[in-house]
């Protein structure tokens, strides 16, 4: 059995790590490098770095940020932000990333997933999916350009359909960002994650809602995800990664020892 992954996330806006609630009202958290170093020292299994404005502004994440982080960490490093071409991927990987994540660009050009997978391998391609639960329709939909709420749009894709589509195109991993839960700290959306787990045959990462130790245990134990991504609880030191891992190990989960 593969060890469950604990993954801190750095959402970056204008060169500073920020965090919002339901993808809105972002507040400054801290510096990119100091947080990256701290999470490595605390025992994170992977680091995810999102330039949340890049796709909305039709630009690529700054390579200098990628290379600076890569120099000070020794864990797998996933990068996202405005990646639209094979050349963009090559540039980011050459700067020190281990894999890339695409979200909004994949919605505009789904076969970008296939082109990247064919060139670099499926293990290099993560697809991020921003999912919002529409109460009126009792349905989950995929949203695009969520890094800027003035440009965010609801797509015609139902989340379950998009999950199946990106797998068919070559996604090697899926990060499901549950927008309703983002920053709320009241737990991951286990209902949606269980549904997605049934149709997801690649590693599935849960994102959005972590607030305490049991939220991590529940998402691993009940939704059977492969990794849990979080930001607020780590940034604000509500939870320290090494202590979280000890808790999960005592609960019987397979966890990489720090």
From Swiss-Prot:
Q: Does the keyword Nuclease apply?
A: no
The record's listing under Pfam families reads: His_biosynth (PF00977)
Catalytic activity field: 5-[(5-phospho-1-deoxy-D-ribulos-1-ylimino)methylamino]-1-(5-phospho-beta-D-ribosyl)imidazole-4-carboxamide + L-glutamine = D-erythro-1-(imidazol-4-yl)glycerol 3-phosphate + 5-amino-1-(5-phospho-beta-D-ribosyl)imidazole-4-carboxamide + L-glutamate + H(+)
Q: Where in the cell is it found?
A: Cytoplasm
Keywords, alphabetical = Amino-acid biosynthesis, Cytoplasm, Histidine biosynthesis, Lyase
Cellular component GO terms, alphabetically?
cytoplasm
Function, please? Answer: IGPS catalyzes the conversion of PRFAR and glutamine to IGP, AICAR and glutamate. The HisF subunit catalyzes the cyclization activity that produces IGP and AICAR from PRFAR using the ammonia provided by the HisH subunit.
Q: Which PANTHER family match?
A: IMIDAZOLE GLYCEROL PHOSPHATE SYNTHASE HISHF (PTHR21235:SF2), IMIDAZOLE GLYCEROL PHOSPHATE SYNTHASE SUBUNIT HISF/H IGP SYNTHASE SUBUNIT HISF/H (PTHR21235)
What assembly does the database describe for this protein? Heterodimer of HisH and HisF.
What protein am I looking at? Imidazole glycerol phosphate synthase subunit HisF
């Amino acid at each position: 059995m593969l060890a469950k992954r604990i993954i801190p996330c750095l959402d970056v806006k204008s060169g500073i790590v920020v965090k919002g609630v339901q993808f809105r009202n972002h507040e400054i958290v801290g510096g990119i490098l100091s947080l990256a170093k701290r999470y490595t020292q605390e025992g994170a299994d992977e680091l995810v770095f999102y330039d949340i404005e890049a796709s909305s502004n039709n630009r690529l994440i700054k390579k200098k940020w990628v290379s600076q982080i890569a120099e000070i960490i020794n864990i797998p490093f996933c990068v996202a932000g405005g990646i639209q071409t094979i050349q963009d991927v090559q540039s980011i990987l050459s700067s020190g990333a281990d894999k890339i994540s695409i979200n909004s660009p994949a919605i505009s050009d789904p076969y970008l997933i296939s082109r990247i997978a064919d060139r670099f391998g499926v293990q290099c391609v993560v697809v991020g999916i921003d999912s919002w639960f529409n109460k009126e329709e009792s349905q989950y939909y995929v949203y695009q350009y969520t890094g800027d709420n003035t440009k965010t749009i609801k797509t015609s894709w139902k989340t379950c359909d998009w999950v199946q589509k990106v797998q068919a195109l070559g996604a090697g991993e899926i990060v499901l960002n549950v927008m309703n839960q983002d920053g709320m700290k009241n737990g991951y959306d286990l209902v949606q994650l269980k549904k997605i787990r049934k149709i997801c045959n690649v590693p599935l990462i849960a994102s959005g809602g972590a607030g305490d130790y049991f939220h991590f245990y529940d998402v691993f134990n009940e939704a059977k995800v492969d990794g849990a991504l979080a930001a607020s609880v780590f940034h604000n030191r509500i939870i320290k990664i090494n202590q979280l891992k000890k808790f999960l190990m005592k609960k019987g989960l397979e966890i990489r020892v720090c």
